[in-house]
Amino acid sequence: MSGNITTAIKETRAFLGRLKGDEEGMAFIEFGFALPIFMALGFTGVEVAGLAIANMRVNQIAMTVADNLSRAKQSVPLGLPQLREVDINDALLGARIQGGGSLEILEKGRIVVSSLQRNASGLQTITWQRCKGKLNAPSSYGAQGATQPSSGTSGFQGMGAGSNRVQAEANSAIIFAEVSYDYKPVFGDWVLGKIRLRREAAFYVRDDRDLTQIYNPSPTASASTCNKLDSTF
């Protein structure tokens, strides 16, 4: 019996000695410890890159919509050029095309376009506002008709965040675009979490244009009013 125990002890010591000197499996052990770290870094890198690209594309859409609608106009005989509902729809449709099938800007986001002007009292006001997209993300500055108070600094004072606020001059208008978008991560929400992108852009209206209203001559177009969460035209 004691001989068997002695033999077992010797074999155990011999095995431990061989194991101590065996370095063939060390690389696999090190790789096993390092793999989760490298995978986490890789996933994070891909997500950050995807987020940066989406952010850039959303920003470009905001700039394009505001720029296009600051230029859009239809010449009329013996009168100032007019902005039409179809012109606004064309700009919003162009944003969907610009975003492409991968971004799905109108399915996962919302575009809000406002015309910031001065009213007869010289106060900043949103004269008109149009929207498109299924995401429930209203304007951060109020709906159509929002007007600067006649006194005080509270309430609507213009559009833009913080020191970047813009105000329209007399007899002019600023086209202000807000684009909100729910970013869909490549690997799921567990890497960066849920992220909503939001970008703004503002352009002064080019040249002379009738600023009193949006026209809708025959054949009429469906107005992209902000009481609808849709992506159709």
Residue ranges with predicted function:
Residues S102-L106:
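Amphipathic, coiled-coil-like alpha-helical scaffolding segments used for oligomerization/assembly
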Residues R96, E107-R198, A202-V205, Q213-T220, ...:
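Intrinsically disordered, low-complexity regions enriched in Pro/Ser/Thr/Gly and acidic residues
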